[in-house]
Amino acid sequence: MDKKEILKEFSADPDKYYNVKLFQEQGFIRKSCAKCGRFFWTLNADRDLCPDDGLDTYSFIGEPPTSKRFDYTQSWKQVEEFFVKNNHTSVSRYPVVCRWRDDLYFTIASVVDFQRVMGSKVVFEFPANPLVVPQTCLRFKDLENVGVTGRHFSSFCMIGQHSVPDLGGYWKDECVDLDYRLLTEQFGINKDEVVFVEDVWAGGGSFGPSLEYFVQGLELGNAVFTEFQGELGKHTTLDQRVIDMGAGLERFAWITMGTPTAYDCCFGPINEKLFGTIGIDSDSEILRKYFTEIAKEIDHYDDLNQVRRLAVKNAGITDEQMQKMITPLEGMYLIADHLRTLIFAITDGALPSNVGGGYNLRMMLRRINATISKLNLKLNIDDLIDLHVDYLKDTYPELDEKRDDVKSILKLESARYEESKVHMKKKADKIKEKGAPSVDELITYYESDGITPEYLKEVDAISEIPSSFYSKLSDLHQSDKKKAIAELPLEGLPETETLFYQDDPMEFSAKVLKVIDDMIVLDRTSFYARGGGQEPDFGSIAGFKVINVDKHADIIVHQLEGGVPKEGETVSCKVDETRRSNITKNHTSTHIINASSRKVLGSWIWQHSAFKDDDHARLDITHHSSLSNDEVQKIEDEANDMIKKNYPVKINYYDRGTAEQKYGFRIYQGGVVPVKSVRIVSIEDKDIEACGGTHVKKTGDIELIKITKTKRIQDGVVRLEFVSGPNAFEYEKQQEQESKRKAEEAVAKEQLEKQREENKSKAREKIPVLLEKVLAGEDVESDGINTKGKLCFTASSDYDDYFHQNFGKKLVGKDSTAAFCGVFEAGPTIRVMVFSGEQSGVNAGEIAKKIASILGGSGGGDAKFAQGGGKDTSKKDEAISKAKSMILG
C-alpha cells in the first residue's frame, strides 16, 4: 500500500481525518510547509515551515523549552503519573524477546506487546483499556548512528498509549487532548511550541491517519489511529479500531534537559563514570554546536560520514577537537547504549551468538570491546552493568534479579572475543591485501569469522564503515521466517473432534468424512497428530495400519497403509497404547529436563526446539557452552528428583491474555500458540508451559529419565538426548552390561599386557642365545624370527624396542653379512627398525622409508641403520608382508 497515496487522500479531507476537537478549541491553524509541502497544525500564525525544516529545529539544546527538568527515569514517572491520573492502567513492560510472535525476534514497538497472530491475521489483545506502558524496544537498523547522532539508540523506551474506542476506550479527540496536556501541563511546555504534523501509518493490511507531535523540531510522539483495512478506495472500517500512540521516553528527557545529546540525560550515573574515564566535560559549547548540527542534517543525507563532515564544518570543529573530544565521546555513548541493550536482552532470555537474533547482540558486544580497545580505556564491564541496573531497577526491577546472569554471559562472550583476535588478525591481513570489501563481503566476514567492521577499521583493513552495513545485517537477522506447510483439499470439512483432549479412549468408532488417496479424515479421533515436536500416534483404522497423522488447521488427517475405508463408513479405530505411553512419558520428561536445565545452568535456558518419539527424545536449549559431565549429571539428578517427588501434572485452559498475565511469557517454550484459549501444562511451580501435547498424570508415572548424549549443535544451542520409562530402564541395563563388558575387557587387557611384559622380559634374556642360533644357521622360527641365511625378520608382539635395538645392533656387529628388520607396535604407532651389515646387500634406509610410508608416516636413517613408523594400523599386515619380502627376498 502506497503511503503517499493514502496521505494525499486523507490530507484532502482534513476535517474527516485530522481536525480534532483540541485544534478547534485552542485555535490551531492548518498550514502547508513552504519548503516540503507537508501539512501541519500550529498555534503560531507566523510559522511557515514544518518542524523538520523550521528555523527552531533543535533549538532546545542548551535552552530547554520546559519549565521542569526530568532525566530518563524521572520522565517516565511524570508520564505514568499523568496517564494514571487520567484513568489509564499502567502496564509493566513486556520482554524485549518477542516470544509471542514467531515472525519477530525482538519487540520493536509498544503495540507489538498486544498483537497476536491468529491464522493469517494479526489481532489485538489488551490487558486493560486504556493503558500506558514503558516498553523497551530493540532496533538494529541504525547501529552505525548510535553514539554519533545524539539521538539514535539500539534500545529505547517507547511510551505506549493504547486505547480501543469501541470497547470502552477513547478515540482521536481524547487522544490528542491527552498528549497535548501531557506536554503543556505535566512537562510545562509552552503551548505555542507544540506542532502536530499530518501523516499516515500502514502495515499488516491495516492503515489509518496519524498525528506526529513536535517541539522545536524534535518529534516526541506519533498518535496512530488504526481504523481501516483493505486497499485504498475499497477499504472498510476495522471491527476493532485501535489507538497506537508511541512516544520516545529518551526524547522527553532530552527536551526537558536540553543536553547536547539525548545520551547525556538517559544513562544516569554511567555517563559520569565514562566521562571521568576520558576526562571530557559533556556540557560544553563545542559539543552543543556539533551535535545540534548533526541533529539538523541527519535526516537530509543517506551517508552518515557526509553528515559528520558537514557538522564539523558548520560547528567550526578542528581536527584536534574531533580526535580528542568528539571521537572518544561517541565511543562512550556507544558503550553505554549497547551495554544497556544487552542487559535488557539477556535479562529477557536472549544470548549473544551467531544465529538468529543473537547475531545483533554479539555484534554489539564486539563493538563495545572494539571501542574499549581502540580508545585504550580501563573499564570494568561489571561496574558499568551495576551502574545501569542500579539506575533502572526502580522502573525495571527484573534487571536487578538477573544482573549476575548478565555479567557471567558477557564475561564469557568477551573472553571468546579475546581468544579469536589472533584468527581475526590473520583474516584482516588477507582482507587488506585483497582490497576494499563490499558490504555483502563485510557481512560474510562478520557472520563467518566474527570480524566486526570496527575491528577492520581499527587495523586499517578498511577506511570507512559503509553506512548500510548494520541495516542490511539487521534485515537478515531481525525476524524468523516460517515455512509454509503443504495444503490438502479439505474445504467444507468441520473441525475434527479431538478425543485425546477428552476421555482419550484407546479404542473408539468414528465416521469417515473424506478420503484423499491413502489419507482419511474422521469426524472425531483419539490419534494424536504430529505437532509441537511430538510424533504422531500409530495404530489401526478399519484394520488398516495408521502410519502417520498430521493436523491441517483444525482438521486431523490420518495416513493409512494397505488400503482405506470408504467415505461415509463408520469404522473401528485402535491407538497403539504402548507407543502412546512411551511418547507421553517422553513429552512430560522434556518439560522436566527443561526445568532441570534452567535450575542447574541459569535463567537464560529456554527451549529452542524439541522432538519426542516413542523410543527416544531430545531437547535443544539455549545455552552458551557445551555441557560438562558434571552439569549433565546434575540435570539428570534434578530431573529424577522431580520424578521421585511425584508432582501432579495439571492441565488447565485460560484465555491467552490471562495466561500471559498470570504466568508470564515463559509459557511459550514451544513457540507461539495461535489460539485464543491456551492449554497450560504445569508441574507445580517448577515448569509451566503452553502445550498441546499428551502428558502423564503425575511425574512418578515416568519412573526414570536417562540422558544418553549431549552436544553443542550450533552457537548458543545445546542438545540433550534422553530416554524415559521402560526405555530408560533398558538403557540403564545396557549401560550396566557395557560397563561390565568394559571392566572384563580391561581385566583381560591388563592380563594380556602383563603376559606380554613377561614375554618381553624373557625375550631380552634370550638375546645372546638367539644370536648364537642365527649366526650358527639354526632355525629360530619357533621364537618368532624368520631367517634366510644371516638375514632376519620378526613381527612378533613379544619383542619390544629394547629387543630390536640390542638384537639388531649386536647381530650386524658380529657378522657384516647379516641384516635385521623388525616391525612392532609402540603405543598407537606401528614402528619399523632396520640394521644391515656392510656386506649384507640390504639398504636399511630404503626399507624403513617404504614401510613407514605404507603406515602413513615417515622414516629416516642411512643404509646401515634406519627406523620409522606410522599410525595407520589398518595397513599393519601389508607393512609386515612388504618388510619381510624386502629383507628376505
Swiss-Prot record:
Keyword RNA-binding part of the UniProt annotation: yes
Gene Ontology biological process terms from the UniProt entry: alanyl-tRNA aminoacylation
Region annotation Disordered: where it falls in the sequence: 734-760, 866-889
Protein name, UniProt field: Alanine--tRNA ligase
UniProt function note: Catalyzes the attachment of alanine to tRNA(Ala) in a two-step reaction: alanine is first activated by ATP to form Ala-AMP and then transferred to the acceptor end of tRNA(Ala). Also edits incorrectly charged Ser-tRNA(Ala) and Gly-tRNA(Ala) via its editing domain.
Binding site for Zn(2+): 587, 591, 691, 695
InterPro entries, per the entry: aa-tRNA-synth_II/BPL/LPL, Ala-tRNA-lgiase_IIc, Ala-tRNA-ligase_IIc_anticod-bd, Ala-tRNA-synth_IIc_core, Ala-tRNA-synth_IIc_N, Ala-tRNA_lgiase_arc, Ala-tRNA_ligase, DHHA1_dom
